[in-house]
């Protein structure tokens, strides 16, 4: 699963997901794409699950670009731990997604195949998405 090789700081604040995505909201590499319609955190496992389904469905001949990367660490405290004694340890990585962000791009396949692959990948995502073309 995806995670940064190294970061400047081990832990981050949770932050807020206000507004829409101004960066990464256009198709750059392929002809078809899956675009987010809601704000959410998408985990590295969910990104990988979507990528696998698209590659499995598109088979050879198609190319896939993953346009998001999980660069935010999410911390968790051990179960049944009392309050206090600092912030928990990093457990997994997420990508902060705002509405309009392109998640995956596809090229080298027909629109029907790309649309079907995007629909299967959309089931793996915790948000509503839409299929877009250039």
From Swiss-Prot:
Belongs to the universal ribosomal protein uL16 family. This is Large ribosomal subunit protein uL16c. It holds the Pfam family Ribosomal_L16. GO terms for cellular component: chloroplast; mitochondrial large ribosomal subunit. GO terms for biological process: mitochondrial translation. InterPro entries: Ribosomal_uL16 (IPR047873), Ribosomal_uL16_bact-type (IPR000114), Ribosomal_uL16_CS (IPR020798), Ribosomal_uL16_dom (IPR016180), Ribosomal_uL16_sf (IPR036920). Part of the 50S ribosomal subunit. Its main location: plastid. GO terms for molecular function: rRNA binding; structural constituent of ribosome. It is found in: Plastid, Chloroplast. It comes from Pinus koraiensis. CDD domains: Ribosomal_L16_L10e.
